[in-house]
Amino acid sequence: MAAVNWLKDEPYPEKPTRRNHLSFGPARLPTGDWDWIMTYYKPEAREWLRTMNNPLWSGPEDVLGLLPAGVPVTEKIFVKEVYPGLKGFLQMFIPVKVAGCLLFGFSPLSRTGMATLKTAPVFRGGYAPAAPGIPMQVYAWEMACKIDAAPRLFKWELIVGEYFVRLATLSECSAGGDVGAYIRGGRPISIEAAAVKTRELASTLYLLAQNNVYHGDVKIANTVITEPHGRLGLIDFEMAHPLDMTMSGLREGLEVPIKWDMVCTDEYRAPEGHGPFPDILSAEAQLVWQVGLFMLDVIGIEIIENRNQGLWEQPDFPGLAAREVGIGRSLLACEHRAFLDYLTIARGCLRTNPRERPRLTLLIAQLTKFIREVATQPEH
């Protein structure tokens, strides 16, 4: 983290003037919720806020619209809940929205100017076997960053108390929330782009597994895009683990409370369950299943409501899928053959028998072939 401190040594109020007004990039703010920024942050911080230029912003309304949902960080929230314990993170981060344990705001450390500060209890996990003293979720996140498959992690701090463990992280902020929220926000995806994002996800999971890193909770809500045409990234590494789950506890004497049957959101768990998972092939079959669900999710097929019905195993699934997608809402118009071929790949990932699912390398090859073929088809 850059050795620059934008916080005032002692906060003191300043009145906004015509020359000394508060703006977030092209959005000039009326007097209100964020006047406290002038009290706590130095003039150079406010000057940077005025000059922010994110390529995703087409006008003032986009400045706050692309930050994930949340309520404004008022002076009361800042003073009581943020400022006392997080000063080390606030030196180069200005929070403007809050949602639960997440603060969204702006930082020059980020390529887009947008950043996220998260501070939350750690209930599961341990230290990374390959990096003593580094929490597994931080190790997994940094490993994903090395392959450009996660928002950049700028700073982290593990706070270990007698009865609790908390982790604070400052990182790049995604555009408009997770990939599903981004698309539902009026940005329908093409069938080619959906396949590209799926290939990026599969490639990321393969490379992480090669380094004995498993995310632990793969789903569309844990995938993001940080910049225009940028690579898909993973977030929320709280359940990250090595294959054999062997980790030392974050607190001395505490057994690591994480097992294979605990990781993964229930709706995204493959039908065979986790079991002990003694080998890489079984773990990879789980990942492929989750990639298949992502393929349906990203084009607007709500799998959570339908997965227990085995919707994709029904003979009339393509017709049902076409009606549920609602062309134009989540998916741009495409050739019918391309739509069917895409569903065929997804259904292959969702076979009940894990041995019948493709390996990640084969899935990546299938998606590459599909993308190449779709690219030669006429546009609609």
From Swiss-Prot:
It holds the Pfam family Pkinase. Keywords: ATP-binding, Kinase, Nucleotide-binding, Serine/threonine-protein kinase, Transferase. ATP binds at K118. Residues 93-371 form the Protein kinase domain. Transmembrane segments: none annotated. One of its GO terms (molecular function) is protein serine kinase activity. Belongs to the protein kinase superfamily. Ser/Thr protein kinase family. This is Protein kinase ORF15. It comes from Ictalurid herpesvirus 1 (strain Auburn) (IcHV-1).
